[in-house]
Amino acid sequence: MASKSSRLSRRRILTTAGVAVGGGAAALLAGSALAAQGGAPALLTNNQGGRRFRAFVKHSNGLPSVETLTVRPLTGRQVLMRTEAAQTCYTNVDQVLIPGVPTNQAVIVGHGGVGVVEAIGPQVISTRVGDRVIVNLHAACGRCFNCLRMRSDKCMNGGAANPGPSCDMGNTPVFSYTGAMSELMITNEEYVTPIFTELPAAQIAMLTCVGGCGLGMTMTNCPVEAASDVVIFGAGPVGLSAVQGAKIKGASRIIVVEPIRYRREIALQLGATDVVDPNQYRERARIAGAGANADQFRDSLVEHLRELCKMKTDRRWAGGGRIGPDHIIEAVGGDRLKPKVEEGPDPTGVLVLQQCWELESAVGTLATCSVGHPAGAMVQISASQWADGAKHHWPGTGGGTNDRRDSYRYVRLMETGQLDMKTLAAASYPLDKTREAYQAAADRTVVATVVTPT
């Protein structure tokens, strides 16, 4: 086996072949790098301007299709990467599978992936040519008001980091943003995190959106304490990542609520102690005499979960009497398309949010991350609980993960065997089969799918 000093790395291959220009601020790649990559998109030597590649593009009101694009010269903080793998997020299935969903501009589909840096703009400082990187769902500039207050998932420079199109489809400008259903990714460095690992790309890709979200809800925003009870609604890729985060943090009981049978089985495999089918607990009625109090319902699922979390004693002077779990994680959301597996009691996802609030104990924590609820849908909360209660609620689509801080930690957990993303990345598709990958995600016949463009 070759020693580390003699082993050829991506960075060594690319930087050896590069020609430094602009005081070393950008790297231009030569043909020898192309030969080393074996099958990468056509590579030029002029700061990538004019380079051609294929991508899955959404334009006008039609369905996305694989198109040939041309790279514009890199500017500012732009980073160009050869894509290794990208995860198909469920939130994109309507854009990909339903004709007539409008878009204001031509865009590369997807948000986040794994790749290797092949060129950088003149102002890039945090990554180099040859780096293996994660392109994250959220930007993290590290300088704005929100980033400085440890809420990089709400970075204020996210939209500004990609101000214009980065490539062209004939005479049509195309915006790349963080789209990774493409042979190349082009985005700003605020979205890019170098990682130093040889783990399979398909597994790392699960961290770019869903995995990082689930782990964030149990490990960062409202971290689970050792020996606590956790209830997780939903066993998709977000929920199953949350299961593993709760296990890593030392939860004693991890209860997963999920209507799909095979996902309940996977939840047990990944660390859940109990699984519950919500379709077996559909009884819900307002408590007699409750009047207009919003949260006075008798819900059979909520009662069952409370019973599972019941302490061994009700003696409050002996530390007992808690009602409900310590932590609740909501990872359900609304159905965008009808699944081909078991359906839950409410396809809008609103009932789950209501049940989470009712289940939460007086001093418990609730983390929510779902999207896709019908416009105008409401969750009812009593005024007294809202104004004078002690429940804690942590919302956010990123689950609280700081991508540039936490991605490397999650990779380390994968390397040590504490975090299993292989089970979640259940099926892999080439770029030409991207629509089929999204269809499988929409059908929910597998936990998650991955596209490997190159």
Question: Where do the protein language model's features map onto the residues?
Answer:
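C-terminal hydrophobic helical "lid"/dimerization subdomain
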Residues: 2-51, 315-316, 322-323, 354, ...
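C-terminal segment of N-terminal export signals and the immediately downstream linker at the start
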Residues: 28-68, 77, 82, 292
